[in-house]
A protein has these predicted regions:
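Short loop/turn motifs at secondary-structure boundaries
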Residues: 286-337
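Exported/extracytosolic protein signature
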Residues: 1-290
């Protein structure tokens, strides 16, 4: 005598795996479909070791089936990379199994100015019932000193970008021989031109040039400079030579270029006369007229040595000329000769 079993406490909501086994005892096994993902990023700054627009971050994704059912069609979606359905290998994960994926992101100047790249990825798998299972990524090696750009994104993967703001200025001078005699005199002018260059890896704003030379008239600015950009036309200055400069024999000084980053950090540089790499003052040598006294005079009207000529005397208008005879007696004196 035989009998098939029946379930004294049948599951009213269950459907037997075999539809004809209506008396089967069904033991419900709780399903817990879960997935997790970590996202780690590494920036390759290239041979120069400085972050530049165009450098690449490589992201590695590790996806784990943390539930108790098999997950299929496992993929990663990443809005930063503009990618969806990044393939995970393997694409089907048994409970406890791990899959991996990778992708790259090319950094922009905005990323460098921000000093970091933040974002989340999402892992998605399908459970045996056809339902999607998702998880937002976390960073397996978080930056302890970093603050996410979006304060609510506490699980964002943050890739730090080294910032190196800097500026350089070159100051060049041209003596304007205003009266055309070939010699500098008080009242003539020097024109200065300034070339400012963004030599760092951050955008620079409110670039200005200052020059402490007393009496200099400086115009131009402020301007902004993109990374690598130079400007040699905005800033110019004019200086009027003084008699003290003539006596000293030169005009020596330096200007300063300063700017701010998007974060308000101030960078500056002392000018060089011909290089972005040094800080040498700009020097204008003032070689004044040389006096040559011709002491032979023959005022006979023959056109040769008819007058007492002192070459270069015109450079010294406030002069006094005295003539002595062979016995040391002054025989002639005149001012402003």
């Amino acid at each position: 005598v035989t009998d098939d079993s029946s379930d004294p406490t049948p599951c009213s909501s269950c459907t037997p795996v075999d539809p004809i086994c209506t008396d089967c005892t069904i033991t419900v096994i709780p399903q817990l479909p879960l997935i997790s993902i970590t996202k780690d990023g590494t920036l390759d700054m290239g041979a120069d070791g400085i972050a530049n627009a165009g450098d690449v971050i490589t992201y590695n994704f590790v996806v784990t089936n943390t539930g108790n059912v098999t997950l299929s069609n496992v993929v990663v979606n990443d809005p930063l990379l503009g990618l969806s359905a990044i393939a995970v290998t393997p694409g089907t994960l048994l409970p406890g199994a791990v899959g991996t994926a990778s992708a790259t992101y090319t950094i922009t100047q905005d990323d460098i100015d921000a000093g970091q790249v933040d974002n989340l990825a999402v892992a998605t798998g399908t459970d045996p019932n056809g339902d999607p299972i998702t998880d937002d990524s976390s960073d397996p090696t978080p930056c302890p000193s970093c603050t996410p750009i979006d304060p609510t994104c506490t699980d964002c993967t943050i890739v730090e970008i080294n910032q190196n703001p800097s500026i350089a200025i070159v100051k060049e001078a041209t003596f304007n021989d205003n009266n055309g005699d070939g010699f500098p005199q008080a009242g003539e002018t020097i024109t200065y031109t300034f070339t400012v260059t963004n030599t760092g890896n951050m955008s620079l704003f409110d670039v200005i040039v200052t020059d402490p030379l007393p009496g200099i008239v400086l115009t131009g600015g402020p301007i902004d400079l993109a990374v690598g950009q130079s400007d040699s036309t905005t800033f110019t200055a004019t200086y009027t030579i003084t008699q003290a400069d003539i006596v000293f024999g030169s005009v020596v000084n330096q200007a300063t270029a300063s700017a701010e980053t998007i974060d308000g950090e101030v960078v500056d540089d002392l000018s060089d006369d011909d290089s972005e790499l040094e800080d040498d003052p700009t020097i204008v040598i003032l070689e004044g007229c040389k006096l040559t006294i011709f002491n032979a005079v023959s005022p006979n009207g023959d056109g040769s040595n008819d007058i007492f000529y002192i070459q270069g005397i015109e450079c010294y208008p406030n002069n006094t000329v005295e003539v002595y005879n062979r016995w040391g007696i002054k025989v002639y004196e005149v001012n402003n000769y």
